[in-house]
C-alpha cells in the first residue's frame, strides 16, 4: 500500500492549509526475480514517482517497500547503502543524467568508486568490458557525453548502471527520448542484458507497444492509483478495466 504525497504550494499569498497532492495512493505489486514488471499510464499518473520511491529518491508517505523480504522504505541512508548498490536506474534523458565534465570512463567508474568496489585499475578494466557489452568501442571511454548521439548516451547510462553488478534496475522511460529507429535496439539490448546477468526490471513507460514486448506483467496506473494488473499478453487480449481499454484502443 505505497503512498507518496507532496505538499502543494498555494497560489494565494497567504494560506493556512496547503494542499496535498496524492502522487501515489495505496499501490501494491510485486516483481518476480529475473522478470520485468511494467508500469503504464498517462503523464502525471505517478509512474516515475513509484520508481523513485522504490529507489528511495522519494521517501514514502506510507506503506512499505520490501526488497528480498527486507523492508527498506523506512531505512536511513547508512542502512540503505548496500541496497543502493543492488538497485540501479536508467532514466529518460541520458544527457542530463551524465556529467558533461566527465569522460565516459569516469562516468562508468564512479559508482564502483562510491561503493568501494575493485581497485582503480580493475574499475577501468570493467569499464572496458561494459562499454563493449553495450555496443560501443573502448576508445569511446575517453570521450565526453556531448560527443555521442542520444542512443549512444543511453547505452553509456546502461553501462554505468551495470557497473556495480545490480540485481534490480528501474528503467524510467528509457527510450521515449530516442528516435523510433533506435528504440527497438535499446529494448533488445535490455532484454539481452537481462538474460546475460539475470536482471529484474521495473519498466516505466507510456508506450504500450513497447511495454507489451518487454514486460512479463503490467500494472496500469491512473492518477496515482493502480487500476489493473495482468500478464502482458492477457492485458492486451482481455483488458478488464475501462481505463485499460481506453489506453489500448488509443494505440
Regions found by a protein language model. Give the residues of each.
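A short, proline-enriched helix->beta-strand linker immediately N-terminal to the Walker B motif
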Residues: 163-167
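ABC ATPase NBD coupling module
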Residues: 13-17, 72-88, 114, 234-239
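Conserved ABC transporter NBD signature motif
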Residues: 63-71
Amino acid at each position: 500500500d505505497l503512498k507518496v504525497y507532496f505538499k502543494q504550494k498555494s497560489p494565494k499569498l497567504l494560506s493556512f492549509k496547503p494542499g496535498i497532492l496524492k502522487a501515489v495512493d495505496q499501490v501494491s505489486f510485486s516483481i518476480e526475480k529475473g522478470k520485468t514488471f511494467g508500469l503504464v499510464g498517462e503523464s502525471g499518473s505517478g509512474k516515475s514517482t513509484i520508481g523513485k520511491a522504490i529507489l528511495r529518491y522519494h521517501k514514502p508517505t506510507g506503506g512499505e517497500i520490501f526488497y528480498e523480504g527486507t523492508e527498506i522504505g523506512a531505512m536511513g541512508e547508512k542502512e540503505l547503502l548496500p541496497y543502493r548498490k543492488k538497485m540501479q536506474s536508467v532514466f529518460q534523458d541520458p544527457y542530463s543524467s551524465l556529467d558533461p565534465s566527465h569522460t565516459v570512463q569516469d562516468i562508468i567508474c564512479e559508482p564502483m568508486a562510491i561503493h568501494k568496489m575493485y581497485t582503480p585499475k580493475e574499475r577501468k578494466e570493467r569499464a572496458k568490458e561494459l562499454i563493449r557489452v553495450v555496443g560501443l568501442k573502448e576508445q569511446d571511454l575517453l570521450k565526453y557525453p556531448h560527443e555521442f548521439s542520444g542512443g549512444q548516451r543511453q547505452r553509456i547510462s546502461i553501462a554505468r548502471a551495470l557497473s556495480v553488478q545490480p540485481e534490480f534496475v528501474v528503467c524510467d522511460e528509457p527510450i521515449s527520448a530516442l528516435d523510433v529507429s533506435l528504440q527497438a535496439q535499446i529494448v533488445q539490448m535490455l532484454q539481452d542484458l537481462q538474460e546475460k546477468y539475470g536482471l529484474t526490471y521495473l519498466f516505466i513507460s507510456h508506450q504500450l507497444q513497447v511495454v507489451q514486448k518487454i514486460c512479463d506483467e503490467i500494472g496500469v496506473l491512473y492518477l496515482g492509483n493502480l487500476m489493473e494488473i495482468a500478464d502482458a499478453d492477457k492485458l492486451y487480449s482481455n483488458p478488464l478495466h475501462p481505463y485499460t481499454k481506453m489506453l489500448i484502443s488509443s494505440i
